[in-house]
Amino acid sequence: MTVITTLGLFIITAIAEIVGCYLPYLWLKKGASAWVLLPAAISLALFAWLLTLHPTAAGRVYAAYGGVYVTIAIVWLWGVDGIQPHRWDLAGVVLMLAGMAVIMFAPR
């Protein structure tokens, strides 16, 4: 699997996970209809299935995926929640992506 394909899969996986968790949050905290739980369940099932598409050890996939997840979560914070990230949020993203790169590109 190419690096671009892997990163794209990580991004789609992160979005599925965040949507799957955000919708119940809307129901529990913001008064959204319980019907949001149906797409939330579908999104979380999609998330679990997407994790199976990665061709390496699950622990390594989860560790590398974490860097992309944090990045997408900060983008979500800004784009969906309307909260501009602080410089420390961005510094954390850089550190997470650096860690992800070490895990992904280390010689095996």
Curated annotation (Swiss-Prot):
Keyword check for Transmembrane:
yes
Q: Where are the transmembrane segments?
A: 3-23, 31-51, 63-83, 87-107
- InterPro entries from the xrefs? UPF0060
SS bond list:
none
**Pfam families registered for this protein in UniProt:** UPF0060
Sorted UniProt keywords: Cell inner membrane, Cell membrane, Membrane, Transmembrane, Transmembrane helix
Query: Its membrane topology, per UniProt?
Result: Multi-pass membrane protein
Q: Where in the cell is it found?
A: Cell inner membrane
Question: Is the keyword Iron assigned to this protein?
Answer: no
GO CC annotation: what is one? plasma membrane
The UniProt similarity line reads: Belongs to the UPF0060 family.
Q: What is this protein called?
A: UPF0060 membrane protein Sputw3181_1172
